[in-house]
Amino acid sequence: MYDVIVVGAGHAGCEAALAVARGGLHCLLITSDLSAVARMSCNPAIGGVAKGQITREIDALGGEMGKAIDATGIQFRMLNRSKGPAMHSPRAQADKTQYSLYMRRIVEHEPNIDLLQDTVIGVSANSGKFSSVTVRSGRAIQAKAAILACGTFLNGLIHIGMDHFPGGRSTAEPPVEGLTESLASLGFSFGRLKTGTPPRIDSRSVDYTIVTEQPGDVDPVPFSFSSTSVANRNLVSCYLTKTTEKTHDILRTGFDRSPLFTGKVQGVGPRYCPSIEDKISRFPDKSSHHIFLEPEGTDTVEMYVNGFSTSLPEDIQIAGLRSIPGLEEAKMIRPGYAIEYDFFHPWQIRSTMETRPVENLFFAGQINGTSGYEEAAAQGLMAGINAVRKILGKELIVLGRDQAYIGVLIDDLITKETKEPYRMFTSSAEHRLILRHDNADLRLRKIGYDCNLVSSDDLHRTESIIKRVQHCLEVMKTAKVTPAEINTLLMNKGLQELKTPARALSLIKRPGISLQDILEHSLSVRSAAEELCNDPRVAEQVQIEIKYEGYIKREQLVADRIARLDSLHIPDNFNYDSLNSLSSEGREKLLKHRPATIGQASRILGVSPSDVSILMIRLGR
């Protein structure tokens, strides 16, 4: 008998299987196609706004995604550099073929993982506890626990114009049938969602004299805290163009054959990644929409047309593409399409990713109603971590909203009603100034180490950074900068000059003055804080802590108040019907979601502050 079975070898499944295996347990990873491990079915990129933060958190906890993109990325950029550090988000174009091969190689070389190419069509449970999965051949495979990471394969249906046919992730991959019905028989509630992808074009058919080049960063920041650099700095550029009124007119002629507008598609699509026809319909006054041309690798001519997701008929797609500046001669290699699939309402999972209806069964990824490689990988990692800890009888790991974007993601899934594919934004995190990409290891490395996913060397390196940052902050509080050292710089910057020596910390707080300015002009500060000159990581943390000290302290106070509510646990079998004073909607939502804490209860839509107060009184809090 296996310890854990992981169903699906996408981004969630790979992280789940690796977490189980590296946690010391024997894992069986089942996938319908071993050549499609960690396949990038949509955009050829990792990271981006909020997603980059999640990727760095995955790495900090000991996951593989960050290392994979550092090894196979072909262009790296830090987004939102002009904004504050809370908004900085790393993003990389991937060679999607190499990314998949990298992850397959990592999975295959993990001794605690066995691989099986087959399709799971059923799940069995005994007395409410997971017992086995059934594969297409009819064989039942037993394990102590299972993690389902099925992606968009559950009863998948692909739409291109008025044509529709079964498909799991692309037009070449079959759906999974029977598994939804099997889970429904165990008491699970499911729904239907939709996502889509744009056409791919031949990069040789683009007129590069018209489109705007977007090169990568000269000195990119790696995703993994274990990487000192990325393997390939800037092998490719991306390109920017935009649709025109002519494009919109052409696409409108196909609306009568659009599955989106004719009612063929029943699933709800992603609000923040709408199809091009949806954008034209929703924003009729907008004369253009940005289009980003993204290479899919260094050994292919395929180019991803970001911003042009569509399920319109093929003839309309190609005509619309050729009306875009720079794409007048575009050759379409693959059409865009929409895909409908089953998902399971995430109020049925706990904060640990374990399902409520069936013990020792975990869900991760798009089966929970999320979108995005990074969101899926994060769920897979947490499901893998907690499956191991459940089997070993250890305390399960729940990340708070003040600890990680991953904690925000999982909490949102449980407390919010998922009516469309969920994706993460920085605006989703109320504590984003303390959940920056640059400090993910400082926040989460110890947890990864405790889960046997982070080496002692990596942990010691992180602990060393924390100590040195604290030392340097103390130096900045006491070290003095003289007028003779700094006044010329202040005068050149149009800032008030010093009349007496000032603390380095107070000078750095001034707009227009950086930590580097102080180090370059003050020998005494430089001598006292030598680490700042030698380690960019330490210098970065010190500057942020000083510049944003007031904001960080204020945010931490709010986070601490919320954390106190999240520390007040509600028994799993709590009888809400015994509280006559609860509002009817509040009682209904509490019974449905079964929050684990008072804090979680307070975030459920429909649960009022009065309901929360009644709960706290009953629980003696």
From Swiss-Prot:
Binding sites annotated in the UniProt record for FAD: 8-13, 120, 366
Superkingdom per UniProt:
Bacteria
Location, primary (coarse class): cytoplasm
Entry GO terms, CC: cytosol
Q: Which UniProt keywords apply?
A: Cytoplasm, FAD, Flavoprotein, NAD, tRNA processing
A biological process (GO) of this protein is:
tRNA methylation
Kindly list the cofactors needed.
Answer: FAD
| Subcellular localization, as worded in the UniProt entry | Cytoplasm
Q: Which GO terms describe its molecular function?
A: flavin adenine dinucleotide binding
Keyword tRNA processing assigned to the entry: answer is yes
Residues noted as binding NAD(+) in the record, renumbered to the chain: 269-283
Q: Is Signal tagged as a keyword?
A: no
The record ties this protein, via Pfam families, to: GIDA, GIDA_C_1st, SAM_GIDA_C
InterPro entries (alphabetical):
FAD/NAD-bd_sf (IPR036188), GIDA_C_N (IPR049312), MnmG (IPR004416), MnmG-rel (IPR002218), MnmG-rel_CS (IPR020595), MnmG_C (IPR026904), MnmG_C_subdom (IPR047001), MnmG_C_subdom_sf (IPR044920)
Quote the subunit structure annotation. Answer: Homodimer. Heterotetramer of two MnmE and two MnmG subunits.
Q: Which family does it belong to?
A: Belongs to the MnmG family.
The protein's job, in short, is: NAD-binding protein involved in the addition of a carboxymethylaminomethyl (cmnm) group at the wobble position (U34) of certain tRNAs, forming tRNA-cmnm(5)s(2)U34.
Name of the protein in its database record: tRNA uridine 5-carboxymethylaminomethyl modification enzyme MnmG
Look up and give the organism this protein is from.
Chlorobaculum tepidum (strain ATCC 49652 / DSM 12025 / NBRC 103806 / TLS) (Chlorobium tepidum)
Its taxonomic path starts at: Bacteria, Pseudomonadati, Chlorobiota, Chlorobiia, Chlorobiales
What gene does the UniProt entry assign to this protein?
mnmG
